[in-house]
Structure formats: C-alpha cells, structure tokens
C-alpha cells in the first residue's frame, strides 16, 4: 500500500510549493484594489486564458485544476468521496427546492460531483429516491415531503444538512485512513458548534438543535444544545472543557474570528500530513488545503470588491496549510 502512494506523495510535495503561504495572502490583501488583486492571482498562474479578468471563472478553474491533479495520480476517487459530500448534498437541497417551488432560477448546482444538477433534479422530480446513495435516500424523501406539504424551507435545509453531517461522520468511521477519520470528526464537531451558536442567537429549541446536530465522539450534542439554551457564555464554558477550547476564545472575540476558527480547525487537523510520506494522507490534505486556499481568496476578492479596509479583510482570512 505504501509503495502505491510514493509517486503520488512525491508529486504532491512538488505542488505544495505553489500553495499560497500566509505571506502570499498578505501580498494579495495589500493589493490596492479588486482589479489589482485579480492581476496578482493571474501572475501567480491562477485561472487560464479563458478566465482572464473574471474572478468566478478563475476560482472555478482552480477547483478544476485540483481535481485534475488528483485524477492524474491514478488513485481511486472513492478515497475523496467524503470531500464532495457538501456539494452533493447541496445539489439534493437545490433539486428539492426547485421541484417543490417550481422556481428554476434561484438554485445553483455543482456539476463536479457524482450526481450533477440535471440528474439530481430528475431524480427528485420523478421521486426516484432509490437512485440516490444510501446516505441520501431517506433525507431526500423526507425533505421533499416536508417542503411539499409545509412549505418550511428551513426544516428542509435542516433535514438534508443533518444527513450530510451523518454521511461525513459515517465515512470517517468506515475509512482506514486516519486523515479521513480526523477530518470527519473535526468537520462534524465544528458544524455542531456553528449550529449551537446560530441557535442561541435565534432562540431555537432543544428539539431543533438535536434534529440539526450530528452525534460525534468529541462533543456531546445534549450538553452543547443545553448550553446554547443558557446563552453564549454557557457555550464558551462547555467548549473550554473539550478539544475545541480555542473556539470558545474565538467566539468571545468576534463573529468573524469564530468563523475563521471554524475553517482553521480543519487545516490544523490535516497539518500533520505534511510529515507523512507513504500514505494517502498528504494527497487528501492537499485537496483540503486547496479548497481552503480558494475559499480564502474568494473572501479577499469579496472584500476588495466591497472596498473593505485591509484590517477588516485580514480578520476574515483563514490559516494557510504551508
């Protein structure tokens, strides 16, 4: 098994050099305006001839490049399924809403997943939920029936988002790869903390939180939801006794500091893979690092477009892998 990944990891090590460091991100933030930031990215090799001057096309092309690299490594794509779950379940959510509301203009699909937009829409339209992966079938049908009969879009979101978290966690439990196990644990725990924070701000009930949160080993859904009912200080107090104590400090600092911590926690989870040479770990870590890099660049470009001060943009910027 280790020999299988030797070439792949060597290739990834060569590519890691071109990942943006914190200092590169600082240079991007220091660009005087949005156009200069785009130019900076293009000079760094982002996008291609067809995407020139178009931020969305540049970012999309970078996502495509990431998966092109992975496919070139001749590693089974099933190893990366868990990373595509957020997009896959998003497509299910978009399809349910489009079919139930008849609104075809609002819902954007991802095409670079196992079930792209048109195929997902047809499955929902035909109510052929058996064509969905096991982890999506029950949630797809339940969300469809809920939205059709109650018109409750938020409950529809909760049903599908919870199923996505359960699928990620299950993938972690079933994977022989430690990076997937750790990624799944951190992803679900951080999502649960986000749900608790949002629920506290919007005065949601315990029942709502327990329906939205996914069980995981590193947090107690029961204790976290109970803390959320008591207030933000209680959430922070609970988190201080867990592996997510830094999240409590970020939460106390500001909403944007907390959002930043949520993503940074995932990067911290995968960082040890920089020192492994004979497992699939560095390859998966590279994909996650690229996704984080693209998300960070998107945040900076949005800040530049809206003419936010550099300090305000910097507060939102994520930690880099390299």
Please annotate each region the language model reported.
Residues 1-322:
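N-terminal domain-start signal
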């Amino acid at each position: 098994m280790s020999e299988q990944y030797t070439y792949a990891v060597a290739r990834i090590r060569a590519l890691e050099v071109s990942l943006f460091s914190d200092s590169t991100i600082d240079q991007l933030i220091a660009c005087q305006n949005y156009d200069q930031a785009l130019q900076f990215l293009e000079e760094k090799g982002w996008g291609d001839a067809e995407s020139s001057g178009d931020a969305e096309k540049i970012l999309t092309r970078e996502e495509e490049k990431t998966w092109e690299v992975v496919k070139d490594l001749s590693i089974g794509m099933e190893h990366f399924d868990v990373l595509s779950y957020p997009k896959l379940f998003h497509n299910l959510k978009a399809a349910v809403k489009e079919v139930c509301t008849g609104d075809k203009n609002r819902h954007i699909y991802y095409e670079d997943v196992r079930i792209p937009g048109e195929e997902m829409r047809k499955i929902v339209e035909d109510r052929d939920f058996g064509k969905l992966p096991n982890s999506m079938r029950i949630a797809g049908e339940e969300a469809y029936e809920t939205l059709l009969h109650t018109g409750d879009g938020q409950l529809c979101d909760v049903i599908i988002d919870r199923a996505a978290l359960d699928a990620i966690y299950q993938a972690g439990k079933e994977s022989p790869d430690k990076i997937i196990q750790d990624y799944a644990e951190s992803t679900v725990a951080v999502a649960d903390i986000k749900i608790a924070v949002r629920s506290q701000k919007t005065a949601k009930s315990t029942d709502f939180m327990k329906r939205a949160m996914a069980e995981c080993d590193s947090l107690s859904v029961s204790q976290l939801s109970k803390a959320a009912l008591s207030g933000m200080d209680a959430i922070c107090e609970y988190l201080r006794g867990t592996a997510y104590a830094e999240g409590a400090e970020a939460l106390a600092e500001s909403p944007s500091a907390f959002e930043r911590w949520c993503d940074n926690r995932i990067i911290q989870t995968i960082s040890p893979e920089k020192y492994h040479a004979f497992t699939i770990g560095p390859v998966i870590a590279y994909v996650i690092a690229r996704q984080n890099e693209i998300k960070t660049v998107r945040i900076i470009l949005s800040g530049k477009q809206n003419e936010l001060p550099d300090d305000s943009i910097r507060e939102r910027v994520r930690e880099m892998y390299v």
